[in-house]
Amino acid sequence: RFLYLSMRHPLTILFGYVTVFLFGMVILPFLNSPRKNFDSIPAFLLHGTIAVWLVIYFGWLGLVLTLLLPFFIASAIGSYLFYAQHNFPGVILKAKKGWTYEGAALESSSYLKTNPVMAWFTANIGYHHIHHINHLVPFYRLPELYRDVPELRQARTTSLHPLEVLRCLRLKVWCVETQRMVGVQGL
């Protein structure tokens, strides 16, 4: 329970470079299955080597400005985008009875409204629900598909508006009784 809630804590999302990338995508997968995730070692060593090289040649400030800060910002944004597209007001989660693949894509993953610049920077990640319906659709075709298939416009939505971000970050667990996501206080 503690681990589940800590994974959904805003600080875990903010420090996504360490929590999501290094620990969640590099270290933990390797520890769980070394043969399957052998590529974690080169990734970890590459990051470490680049960090040491930057400190030697450019000092600590060089490390912070060229590696840590950009990775910190990108990982925090990426971690939040993933979180918000699965934990948002109006999300619907169903047990096996009543669950369908398409229903889960449209009701349990969101359409994240973004401006054209953010859509470009994130490779149209806002169309996440379409990705869950068919992951083979290239990112550059997602807006076209969204426009041309009316059913895809019925997905639950969220945005990067500060109030919407706060609403998403407050949601932690699915309440079976009320059939909605709630914060820790709602337990």
Residue ranges and their predicted role:
Residues F2, K97-G98, N115-P116, T157, ...:
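Coil-to-alpha-helix initiation sites in intrinsically disordered, low-complexity, charged segments
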Residues I73-A74, Y127, L142:
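Internal amphipathic alpha-helical segments of the cytochrome P450 catalytic fold
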Residues A84-N87, L112-K113, L163-R167:
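Juxtamembrane/interface motifs at transmembrane-helix termini
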Residues S108-P138:
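Acidic, Ser/Thr-rich low-complexity segments on the non-lumenal side of membrane proteins
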Residues I130, H135-L187:
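A membrane-cytosol interface segment of integral membrane proteins
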